[in-house]
């Protein structure tokens, strides 16, 4: 019987994928490729952020001393708070939006009245981060959050601020990079990272569907395989399976942390009136004033309140220090002080609060244990941020983050290795483009993170040039180093179009090795604190740990560069090798 060709209608009705597994493979490949570059940034700088305070100590030698408890408010914090001014950038950006022009001209920045104070410290902080909210006198929305903010970091032993212009590279640069890309225009960075987090959860689930023999693949790794494609896939599968719970947890909790106020801010938009009524009712129920009374009142001794809070915590069987302090309605009869126990021995960021009337020191309220929903949210948030004391878990976080980087990087390699020879035959530039982006995002990103540390040690502390201080120049050099790595990756990956390895990988590994070694040596030269001193004679683990990590990364990068050179030599045709040696 003669077979007839399928009609156009039948052809058009054919499914795009033969089965569900093929569909999941497509989703895994293209979602992972499209957003894997963002996820690489999140995982790498998230891993560095686990030790953000330690990186700060390395970057700011003046802060290299032992962690300190919350200092005296009356003697140290109060003068520091009173010296705070609204941030110039925050004032310029938000004051025109918050101020009601029909009520007259804007209040000058330095004349805004302080409305709230806060200070926060952990068991790893030698210095104290503190800030203030300054009220906008004539706001457009009297029920809104009408504050211009100012922040500083002080030495809690003396109350003096850290050196002006000093950038806390760990907590103020690497840490926000992993959740905002340090791109604050219309909060675009937050949204991109949130989308990437959801895509990662989808990629992990589709990866499980793709690899049905998960447990066998977990124990399969062939580093000596002749094909880079095979060893890259093995390592991709192994790291993805081994750290699967870690990856899923951090992707979902990362989105959860920002869901309430960034991704689904219904309490500040459509439900804003209801939210305000709820806050007023809650203030009435708790006895904590929601608004200012408009009557000036003095401030009682906050040190006495801190002593009373410590006594009450000890009586409840959980002795501890104050970790978080806030003062609401500064200078007003409705002012009150909230003291929260440091959370170093618990997953939640802080313990239950005790609230005092600011003018008299009388206890207004002791917070009850949180309900199920609040406790779950506190637990998940605290486990993600990990401000509690658990050094083994902290290192496991780093390992999990680096395994995430490995999983993503090997996914890029597998994509390129699988397609580059076919693309070389057809003249397609797809593999070459992905390889250049992957090089810039993997080795280029690491090189940029080391370059900012080198710049930190080379630039003078009192630098002021072209309106920028030292911290501004460090940020600029970070982006410049990353951009240079991207340009280098594009310029040097022509061999990929011929089905061979791009030399940019090897050369950027060499740059990482040089930068890592240079950063450790420059720390010794500029501060006199070498590893023998920080490990043995005057042990200081934050600096020693950063130096050791830099040297270890430099050694790994040097070994990788050597292996890449050997692979490239093996791929080079014999006539070309003879010509190169002629």
Segments the model singles out, each with a brief description of its role:
Residues 2-582:
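Conserved histidines in hydrophobic membrane contexts and catalytic metal-binding motifs
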């Amino acid at each position: 019987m003669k077979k007839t060709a399928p009609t156009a209608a039948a052809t058009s009705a054919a499914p795009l994928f033969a089965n569900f597994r093929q569909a999941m493979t497509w989703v895994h490949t293209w979602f992972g490729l499209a957003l894997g570059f963002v996820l690489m940034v999140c995982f790498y700088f998230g891993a560095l952020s686990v030790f953000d305070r330690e990186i700060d100590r390395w970057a700011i030698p003046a802060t290299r001393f032992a962690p300190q408890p919350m200092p005296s408010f009356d003697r140290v914090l109060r003068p520091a708070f009173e010296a705070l001014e609204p941030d110039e950038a925050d004032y310029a950006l938000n004051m025109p939006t918050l101020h009601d022009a029909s009520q007259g001209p804007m209040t000058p920045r330095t004349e805004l009245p302080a409305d709230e104070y806060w200070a926060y410290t952990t068991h790893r902080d030698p210095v104290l981060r503190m800030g203030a909210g300054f009220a906008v006198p004539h706001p457009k929305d009297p029920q809104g959050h009408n504050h211009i903010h100012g922040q500083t970091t002080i030495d809690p032993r003396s109350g003096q601020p850290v050196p002006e212009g000093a950038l806390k590279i760990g907590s103020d640069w690497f840490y926000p990079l992993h959740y905002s890309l340090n791109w604050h225009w219309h909060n675009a960075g937050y949204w991109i990272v949130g989308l990437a987090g959801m895509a990662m959860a989808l990629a992990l689930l589709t990866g499980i569907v793709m690899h049905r023999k998960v447990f066998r693949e977990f124990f399969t790794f062939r580093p000596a395989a002749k094909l880079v494609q095979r060893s890259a896939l093995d390592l991709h599968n192994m790291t993805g399976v081994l750290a699967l719970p870690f990856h899923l947890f951090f992707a979902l909790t990362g989105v959860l942390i920002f869901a309430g106020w960034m991704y689904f801010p219904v309490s500040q938009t459509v439900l804003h009136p209801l939210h305000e009524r709820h806050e007023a009712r809650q203030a009435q129920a708790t006895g904590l004033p929601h608004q200012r009374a408009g009557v000036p009142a003095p401030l009682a001794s906050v040190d006495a309140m801190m002593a009373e809070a410590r006594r009450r915590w000890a009586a409840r069987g959980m002795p501890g220090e104050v970790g978080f302090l806030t003062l609401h309605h500064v200078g007003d009869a409705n002012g009150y002080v909230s003291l929260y126990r440091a959370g170093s021995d618990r997953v939640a960021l802080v313990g239950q609060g005790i609230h005092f009337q600011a003018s008299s020191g009388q206890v207004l309220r002791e917070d009850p244990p949180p309900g199920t929903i609040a406790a779950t949210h506190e637990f998940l948030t605290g486990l993600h941020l990990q401000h509690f004391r658990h050094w083994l878990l902290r290192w496991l976080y780093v390992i999990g983050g680096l395994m995430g980087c490995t999983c993503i990087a090997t996914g890029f390699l597998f994509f390129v290795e699988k397609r580059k020879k076919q693309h070389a035959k057809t003249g397609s530039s797809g593999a070459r483009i992905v390889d250049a982006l992957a090089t810039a995002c993997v080795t280029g990103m690491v090189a940029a993170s080391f370059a900012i540390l080198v710049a930190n040690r080379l630039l003078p502390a009192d630098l002021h040039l072209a309106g920028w201080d030292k911290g501004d120049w460090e940020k600029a050099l970070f982006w410049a180093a990353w951009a240079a790595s991207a340009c280098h990756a594009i310029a040097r990956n022509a061999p990929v179009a011929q089905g061979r390895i791009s030399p940019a990988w090897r050369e950027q590994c060499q740059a990482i090795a040089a930068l890592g070694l240079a950063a450790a040596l420059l720390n010794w030269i500029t501060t006199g604190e070498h590893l023998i001193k920080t490990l043995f004679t005057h042990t200081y683990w934050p600096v020693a740990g950063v130096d050791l990590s830099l040297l270890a990364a430099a050694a790994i990068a040097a070994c990788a560069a050597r292996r890449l050179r050997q692979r490239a030599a093996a791929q080079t045709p014999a006539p070309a090798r003879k010509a190169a040696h002629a």
